[in-house]
Amino acid sequence: MSVKHIQDNSNQEIAARIIQRAWKTFLNVSVYQHFKSLIDLRRQGEPRQIVRYINPKEAQLLDAAAGVQVRFRLGGVRFPPEIYYKIFTHRHIEDLCANSPRDYTKLPARYTSHNKDDPPQVEDNSGWYRRVENNGWRPVSYRFWMPLESGVVDSTKESEFHFSKLKRKQDLEKKRKIKKIDWMRQMYYMGSLEAKATDNETLGLIHKATKGLIKSIEDGGVDSVMEWEVDEVLNWTNTLNFDEYIASWRETATSNSSANLKDVKLQRIQKSLQSNIYGDEAKQAEESLYDDSTYYENAYTKQFTRLTPDSMFGM
């Protein structure tokens, strides 16, 4: 076999690999676009109706007064990805965890004994103030038709829930600050941070401040910088607003809130009641007008302007 023939075969193999790789990339992109189009929502749709198609058993537990909202995300460890959903509530809900700190799953039985030598055991308070919501990201699949033992559909991530409202607010602000710092650090190392200024001296100051802020975070931790410092650097270094980015991300693949939806049947009843009330009031006013004995007299009585000594007409 000649050298030229071997080179031609190798060139054909390289070309075939390029075509196969391009075709595989096209298929993967098409599959991803298909899954993305399935959850292409932005505050659209009635939450209970959407969950009814996914999990009819869970849809029966939804209450519109809770301000329910459903979010969808793509995830998984393999391709093509799976569609996950999670139910959020935007109104205050009173539950057992909010009213009492006890762990009711491990309450001891009642102990009654008159023997002082055998006192009851001291109640263990280690599990108190631990909140488990059982509301993680669940895959949209046929698993809800199976028993619960056949598959785990909930996430194993634990979230802390402190009894103090002030402490919960501080933790929420700290998490938001950590997200901003991680976002800024990732964009800094990827080279995506772009300064808004064009002056060389200003660019040097911005770059120096950004580098010093990231170094302070890496040396002293998150608590070594304030949130307003991170906001200042983000405002100077990037045209993309972090808060707008987070707000847009939360609205992506999200249904409408049940708090914004009104029942059509209830609206019809309200309209009919209002029309009946206003109709009766107008009818009563018209009847009282014609029942007045002076109505016809007042209709044809000439109206004159009375002059008094204090009048200023003609002066």
Curated annotation (Swiss-Prot):
This is Protein MFI. PANTHER family: NADH DEHYDROGENASE (UBIQUINONE) 1 BETA SUBCOMPLEX, 4, PROTEIN MFI. Transmembrane segments: none annotated. It is found in: Cytoplasm, Cytosol; Mitochondrion outer membrane. Keywords: Cytoplasm, Membrane, Mitochondrion, Mitochondrion outer membrane. The keyword Membrane applies. One of its GO terms (biological process) is negative regulation of mitochondrial fission. Acts as an inhibitor of mitochondrial fission. Interacts with MFF and prevents DNM1L recruitment to mitochondria, promoting a more fused mitochondrial network. CDD domains: C11orf65. Disulfide bonds: none annotated. The lineage of its organism: Eukaryota, Metazoa, Chordata, Craniata, Vertebrata. Can homodimerize. Interacts with MFF; the interaction inhibits MFF interaction with DNM1L. GO terms for cellular component: cytosol; mitochondrial outer membrane. Enriched in the pancreatic beta cell and the testis and is expressed at low levels in other tissues tested.
